[in-house]
Amino acid sequence: MFARAVKPHDGIIMFRAFVYDNHINETNWKADRANAAVDFFKDLDGKFDENVVVQIKYGPIDFQVREPVSPLFSTLRNTSTAIELQVTQEYLGQQTHLVYLAPLWKEILDFDLKADDRPSKVKDIVSGERFRRPLGGSAGVVNVGTNSTWLGSHLAMSVGL
């Protein structure tokens, strides 16, 4: 609905794909929370308008310090996607430590999901190149506060730059 309304104005809709709980039974130790977004979105692949980009968190859980790359990147082959990167440091010492995130981002973007046993680096998927999609991109998530530095630290804003 929104995509069609903004299309005449060359508008793009970013649809955030964060699925926190897709009816997973927490008492079942074999339930796969990391696959919840795939379960939710796999049947929607190709059903979004061409001016919609599905924004996917780099990992399937929730910006944990170390987590695998989201399998949703290689699942949505007929839908334009963007990667959502963590800039905020809520899980990385609450901004009481200096954390340089560029190596983490590089590792994620260079990760090869090997879709169909072919090279499928995350950076090639979100650029639109791997699955020949017209759109793609990246987004950063920050927690902006009300103090003089906005992010709680004089260096926090420079971490992602």
Annotate each PLM feature.
Residues 2-161:
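Substrate-binding groove of N-acetylhexosamine-processing glycoside hydrolases
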